[in-house]
Structure formats: C-alpha cells, structure tokens
C-alpha cells in the first residue's frame, strides 16, 4: 500500500473508532483513539490490509470484539473518502478487520512511480536532521580485509537508506594510527628494507608477513611519494635506520592503498579522523581530566579506573595503566566527545561483534562527563565474521595480505579475474571490477549484520537464478529488453505509458507485483528506523521474483494495445523501482546481460 493511502486509511479508521466509541459511551465521553496499526495479512486470501484495533478496544469499551469490529467497519465504509480506497471488509476470528483495497488503489502505484521517478520511495520527513555514520575505521597497517568489506557495505548502504528519509548523512572513517600496531608496521617495513623476509633469522616476531610490506619497503628505498586523499604527500627518505621516517611513509602508503580499495568498492567518506590528533590536540588528556573532576574515577594499584559500573557495566575499567599509557577505549571516549561537540546528536557506529565489550565503557565515559549526552549514545550496528569459500574450500590466506583475504581480492575474484591476475591489477579491466563490486556489495548486505556470512566465490560467478545479484540485475535487463522491443515493434515509447488503461491489470500476478512495488517506500522507512540495510536486498530479491512470476504468466508484447500498454507500464514502473533499490545498494542496473 502506498504511504499516502496508508495514512488516509489510518485516519479513516481512527475517525471510525471514535464515532463508535462515542456511540457506545456517549458523545461527551472522553476518548482518544489509539494508534492504528495496519499490517499485510500473512495469507493473501484474507485481504490486503489487517487491523486489530477492535481487539485492543473491546475491553475498555465494554463490548464484544467481533461486534465492535462490525461497528467499526460499518462506520468506515460509510465514509465517502473510503469509497475509492476500500473495496470490501471482512471480520475474521474474534475480531480482526481484514480490508480489500480497490483495484484503482492498487494500480495507483504505477502513476506514483512514473511521477516521482528516482525519488520514488524517498521522503523528506527527517529533513533538517543530521546523522554521523562511522564505519570501516581500519588500522593503517594493511589492506582492508573482508570484515572491513562487510562494514563498508553495511555502512554505505545504511547511509543511503537513512539519507532516503531526508537526513543529512555524514560518513566518517576513524584511523587508529596510534599504538602498538603502528610500531609493528614500522619494524616490519624496516626488516623488509634490510632484505629480510618472513621465516628468516632476525625477522621480528611481531612483524606483518604480507607481500604488501615488501612493496612499501621497495617504494621507501626508491624515495617514491605517496599521499592519502586527505593527507600531505610523504616521500620515502630511503634511510633504513630512520624508523620514524619509515613509520610515516608506511602509514601514508597504506592509507593510500586503503583509499584505492574503497574507491574500487564505491565508498566515499566525508571525513577521515586521525586517532593521533586526539593526542596531539590534548583531547585525550582533557577528557580524562574531566572525568577525574566529575568524580567518575579512582586510583588503585597505580592505575586510574573509570566507574563504569555506575552506568551498568559488569565491572569498573582501567583507563590509565600503571605505566602511564591509556587503555584502548579512552581515546574512543575522547573521539565521541568530538562527535557531540560537532553537533551530531545521532551517531551510528558500524563495528565487528568483537567490539561488543567496548560499548558499555564508551557510553559510561560519555555519561560520566555530564555534558548532556543522552544515554545510549552512540548507536551501534555490530556484524559477525565473513568466511570466504572458493572451489568448495575455505580461503584463509592471500598473497597480497599474507594472513587474510582482502576486499580487493574479493572484488577481483567475484568479477571473474583469472588466478594470478590479482598480482598484476593492471591486467584487470573496469568491467571485471564493476561485476565484482556489484557482487560483493550485494552479497555482503544480503544477510542481517548479526549473522555470520559465508561468501561463496563460485556462487558470485554464476549467471543464473541461484546468484541473487544476477537474479535482480537480470530482472532489470529483461525489462529493458522488453521495452526496447516495444519501441521497435509497436513504436510505443516509455514516455507514452503513463496514459495506459491500468484497469487491464487484474491478474493475480499483476496485482501481487503492484502490491510489492507499493511496499518500497515503507520498506525504506522501516530499514532506516531499525538500522537494517539488509532489508533492501531482501526486498529486491522478492521484487525480482514477483516480476518473473508476472512475466512468465502474461505476454506483454501482444497486438491488443490496451493490455499491452498496461502491462508495459507495469514493467516500466518495476524497472524504475529496481533501479532505485539497486542505487541504494550501490549496485549497477545493467540494461543488457
């Protein structure tokens, strides 16, 4: 049901309920109608819309729920505004109200799609509000792995979903460029620069083993220049003994590499925030001092502890260790203070499920500052791990990364790159990258974040209905082909289809497809509210299924103009909604396959 129709029907039902309540209790009786909840019945034969308001109000109004439902239905159908919307009403069971919409109400979605085009499904109800989404936020110590890829897909699609509701969305990447890992990166690069490799005597125990370290060392020695998108160019000094220079070059090199990974994945960020800046600007010290002054800390065993149990944590947590260094959640608290100070009253973090333990600590620290930050700030979407399968075997290693599969590997493999090509990316064409990006983005968003995901490379390469992204894209391409043939054979352009006689669309398959199209706006609203980007992928698979059912049941290219143009109009509307949904996922909508 279209949102406008839903709002109208909710208002009509609320008015009908009020009429019945006053008839039962008296016109002067105080009564406020409850929020009307409309749902689609699980069984199509029960109607198009179901409502349980009679069950809710029977006891307060002192009447039988079924009799109450009958009175509500009588009041509803008597209202002139309901005539073009409600075709029939039935009472089921103890008092459920089942409504059937008129054919015109169901067909109205086609006109709405034609009128709104790319904007169909979007809303401006949240215009003027802003949301910060932080995701990926990898250490600049290696290429992005498949876990980062899942974060990138979840974060980018969720950002698109939230933006569809009118929010101004700010995408942010937090670089953990301070700490032990960065030191390990520097000594790894230094060892490679000295000619050592993993397994050699003298190879540092904490060093990273991926081939990318050798690439960094080579470019450092060759005095190459690298730069991240938001950073100053850094030129390799070539000095093997200058560990600080090696560190700066290695971080810049890997940030640039991660930029390239994200570009291949179709993800753009509005801002990159460096953890190191929290220290250089004194924000970590300032945050700790504020918590001490607020009485939220105490000293024990030479360490500074935060009273996180005051905010529901299972035990207090160390903030500053006895050696004077901070535990990892302390800069996170300082970082989130900056988010609040920048005016972001709604913040969503996409992180791996292994970060679950930090949530209570960060929130406790923010509450302890007493600066007006609400409880439950920030929101979190936690995701589980990704397992990569190829040729029926789990893939655990990558030549590029050494100990894990990278996002770039996944894109190239899913695009059909031949084994060995990933070592020579110049051999991989843009079409391969596009196919791979489409598959990876769709696959990684096609399960709920809190479920583990098995990424099957072989499935991603299949060109049949088993492959979900192919299934959806093929539906779009098939419609494009039909509409091209419509123009070629009958000289009917899509621009002429809004004038089609939609009363021709009466088959069960046509009605079901129209109903699925009408669900798109509410699906986006629900996905934004519940932080559930997977809902878009679920919807598109269902929509493609409804299209295929319709297309297999009814011929579109027939000589009879009225049914032909009506069916073509339905296909054109379906194509538009497929395009809109795929755009939210950041997946292409090919006209040919």
UniProtKB/Swiss-Prot annotation:
GO molecular function: arginine-tRNA ligase activity; ATP binding
Primary subcellular site in the record, as a coarse category: cytoplasm
Keywords associated with the record: Aminoacyl-tRNA synthetase, ATP-binding, Cytoplasm, Ligase, Nucleotide-binding, Protein biosynthesis
Catalytic activity: tRNA(Arg) + L-arginine + ATP = L-arginyl-tRNA(Arg) + AMP + diphosphate
EC number of the protein: 6.1.1.19
Coiled-coil parts of chain: none
Entry GO CC: cytoplasm
Entry superkingdom: Bacteria
Top-level enzyme category: ligase
Pfam family of the protein (one): Arg_tRNA_synt_N
Motif ('HIGH' region) on chain: 138-148
InterPro entries: aa-tRNA-synth_I_CS, Arg-tRNA-ligase, Arg-tRNA-synth_N, Arg-tRNA-synth_N_sf, ArgRS_core, DALR_anticod-bd, Rossmann-like_a/b/a_fold, tRNAsynth_Ia_anticodon-bd
Compartments reported by the entry: Cytoplasm
Subunit structure: Monomer.
Family according to the record: Belongs to the class-I aminoacyl-tRNA synthetase family.
Name of this chain's protein: Arginine--tRNA ligase
Species per Swiss-Prot/TrEMBL record: Burkholderia ambifaria (strain ATCC BAA-244 / DSM 16087 / CCUG 44356 / LMG 19182 / AMMD)
Gene: argS
